[in-house]
Amino acid sequence: MTMKMMVHIYFVSLLLLLFHSYAIDIENEITEFFNKMRDTLPAKDSKWLNPACMFGGTMNDIAALGEPFSAKCPPIEDSLLSHRYKDYVVKWERLEKNRRRQVSNKRVKHGDLWIANYTSKFSNRRYLCTVTTKNGDCVQGIVRSHIKKPPSCIPKTYELGTHDKYGIDLYCGILYAKHYNNITWYKDNKEINIDDIKYSQTGKKLIIHNPELEDSGRYNCYVHYDDVRIKNDIVVSRCKILTVIPSQDHRFKLILDPKINVTIGEPANITCTAVSTSLLIDDVLIEWENPSGWLIGFDFDVYSVLTSRGGITEATLYFENVTEEYIGNTYKCRGHNYYFEKTLTTTVVLE
């Protein structure tokens, strides 16, 4: 073996050793992070945990009344922990004040907590899940849920010429339950034929190819679920209102007074205005920058407020109490959209 080869092997071995040591350090830090999280749990939760098991976090999932609900055990879904558990079984238990009860098989689907018809009584319940691997390691998590009312119909506007080669994406917003069987789409109450020419479907997305004005309309997606016992007995729907508009003129005019006339000890404000001819709402975004180049948000002392109506966007810069340090400062107003960007400046001066 040559000296060059020995040196190469030495450095490769050293790198592998360092990488292994670094990986161990990361895993130890992850474990410590979840141990600290466990210590902050309220007593009503922590008393049910098995000290021999690692703690893998809590989850508060969204549910909709009258719809299916499912939840994964937190450590299985957590990006910091999921890589540790590949071959495992999950046990679910409902936590009550003075006892815990095993969840029946009808409420478990593919290892997840599954509730076919979520009602308000479930929103107050806590569930403990225990993941046990093939070699006997275990990790636990706690799941709660809260109710969110789904929107009746979500509007979406698409401008022709924007991303025509990719088509229009419509997402079926079923977020509260996994393991659905299939999704069917309707336009204006007529079922859509997924022919992979005009329409294609990927997971929860409907893709409308070669967009045109006639694609405007009401789109409903119907999600079909298999319950544990009965096939295709649950259907949930969501709605989108699509408006396709012609290609727009995205040019705009930015208007700003070059001076802010102020009085020491008093409030002051100035408005930067963008006037657009586009039909799109919020086509122009306006931002204020301070003299150091930092964006100004809704902070104390100096802050900005954005409003938009009928093709006019305004960003007002407010000074709560003008002091001498503001005199002579120059602030930049930046208006931009996907196509254009314009900037104007204004300087604080004493009246």
Swiss-Prot record:
Q: Where in the cell is it found?
A: Secreted
Q: What induces it?
A: Expressed in the early phase of the viral replicative cycle.
According to its UniProt entry, one GO biological process term is:
symbiont-mediated suppression of host type I interferon-mediated signaling pathway
Question: Its GO CC terms?
Answer: extracellular region
Which interval of the chain is the signal sequence?
Answer: 1-19
Question: Which cysteine residues pair off into disulfide bonds?
Answer: C73-C129, C172-C221, C272-C333
Report keywords, A-Z: Disulfide bond, Early protein, Glycoprotein, Host-virus interaction, Immunoglobulin domain, Inhibition of host innate immune response by virus, Inhibition of host interferon signaling pathway by virus, Interferon antiviral system evasion, Repeat, Secreted, Signal, Viral immunoevasion
Give the Pfam families listed for this entry: ig, Ig_2
List each copy of the Ig-like C2-type domain by range.
65-137, 155-237
Which residue positions carry a glycan here? N117, N182, N261, N269, N321
- Where does the Ig-like V-type domain lie? 246-345
Family to which the UniProt record says this protein belongs:
Belongs to the interleukin-1 receptor family.
What interactions and quaternary structure are annotated?
Interacts with host IFNA1.
The record's function comment reads:
Counteracts the antiviral effects of host IFN-alpha/beta and key IFN-inducible proteins involved in viral RNA degradation suxh as host OAS1. Acts as a soluble IFN-alpha receptor and thus inhibits the interaction between host IFN-alpha and its receptor.
Q: Which PANTHER family match?
A: INTERLEUKIN-1 RECEPTOR FAMILY MEMBER, X-LINKED INTERLEUKIN-1 RECEPTOR ACCESSORY PROTEIN-LIKE 2
- Specify the protein name: Soluble interferon alpha/beta receptor OPG204
Origin species, per record, is Vaccinia virus (strain Dairen I) (VACV)
